[in-house]
Curated annotation (Swiss-Prot):
It comes from Exiguobacterium sp. (strain ATCC BAA-1283 / AT1b). Its EC number is 3.2.2.9. The gene is mtnN. It catalyses: S-adenosyl-L-homocysteine + H2O = S-(5-deoxy-D-ribos-5-yl)-L-homocysteine + adenine; S-methyl-5'-thioadenosine + H2O = 5-(methylsulfanyl)-D-ribose + adenine; 5'-deoxyadenosine + H2O = 5-deoxy-D-ribose + adenine. Belongs to the PNP/UDP phosphorylase family. MtnN subfamily. GO terms for biological process: L-methionine salvage from methylthioadenosine; L-methionine salvage from S-adenosylmethionine; nucleoside catabolic process. One of its GO terms (molecular function) is adenosylhomocysteine nucleosidase activity. The active site is at E12, D198. One of its GO terms (cellular component) is cytosol. Pathway: Amino-acid biosynthesis; L-methionine biosynthesis via salvage pathway; S-methyl-5-thio-alpha-D-ribose 1-phosphate from S-methyl-5'-thioadenosine (hydrolase route): step 1/2. Keywords: Amino-acid biosynthesis, Hydrolase, Methionine biosynthesis. Substrate binds at G78, I153, M174, E175. This is 5'-methylthioadenosine/S-adenosylhomocysteine nucleosidase. InterPro entries: MTA_SAH_Nsdase, Nucleoside_phosphorylase_d, Nucleoside_phosphorylase_sf.
Length: 233
């Protein structure tokens, strides 16, 4: 098995990249790929850059050029669920766009024409992630809907707008839906796991800057534990 791992930012991939053995670096169209092994698991890590277009292009290159069997999207997110704390980890049950509106033509809010309203994460990967995280010390795990848009959400009015369109939102971020959509189109199983860096409120930018490192460390721990579990499966 080969696992594709996607993080948007340097902080979200550097810990994993530094753990690779037999590492090979490749650059394609300004996207950076890092092949190697985490333990005995063959992986390829993509630093995609921030935002939906970057994520979609990078994921397409990852799948087309490196042929991963599964894809894990990791990194940070803004938390929506009550009781969620910075450093907690969210595992996606499904992923949707929160900034797509073609409802005038009969589509659901968030649905891209010709695509499903939601992209369901692979049930086996969700189960593995949940089980692994529950056994990590000092990390709380949540499951739920992750929504994606090309904006950093730090406004309670925008939070209310998102919650008005979707039930059960666990977290918001900027890359998961196009990654999920690309995996759907290529038929590659995926899961999104995000560590909470902020609460998507008016203090979100300050919280994000302060807690990105914590969120990134927790995400890296989780991904390494998941690849180890998949290696044993």
């Amino acid at each position: 098995m080969k696992v594709g791992i996607i993080g948007a930012m340097e902080e979200e991939v550097n810990l994993l990249r530094n753990e690779l053995t037999e590492r090979v670096d490749t650059e394609i169209a300004n996207y950076h790929f890092y092949e190697g092994y985490l333990g005995n698991m063959q992986v390829v890590i993509l630093k995609s850059g921030i935002g939906k277009v970057n994520a979609a292009i990078g994921t397409t290159l990852l799948i087309d050029k490196f042929k991963p069997d599964v894809v894990i999207n990791t990194g940070s997110a803004g938390g929506f669920k009550k009781g969620m704390k910075v450093g907690d980890v969210v595992v996606s049950t499904e992923v949707r766009h929160h900034d797509v509106d073609v409802t005038a033509f009969g589509y659901e809010y968030g649905q891209v024409p010709g695509m499903p309203p939601a992209y369901e994460a692979d049930a086996k990967l969700v189960s593995v992630c949940k089980d692994v995280i529950e056994n990590l010390p000092d990390v709380n795990v949540h499951q739920g809907l992750i929504v994606t848009g090309d904006s950093f959400i730090n406004d309670s009015k925008r939070v209310a707008d998102i919650l008005g369109h979707f039930d059960g939102v666990a977290a918001v971020e900027m890359e998961a839906a196009p990654i999920a959509q690309t995996c759907y189109q290529f038929g590659v199983p995926f899961v999104v796991t995000r560590s909470i860096s902020d609460s998507a409120d008016e203090e979100a930018n300050l919280s994000f800057d302060e807690f990105l490192e914590t969120a990134s460390i927790n995400s890296a721990k989780m991904v390494m534990a998941v690849t180890k579990r998949l290696e044993q499966a």
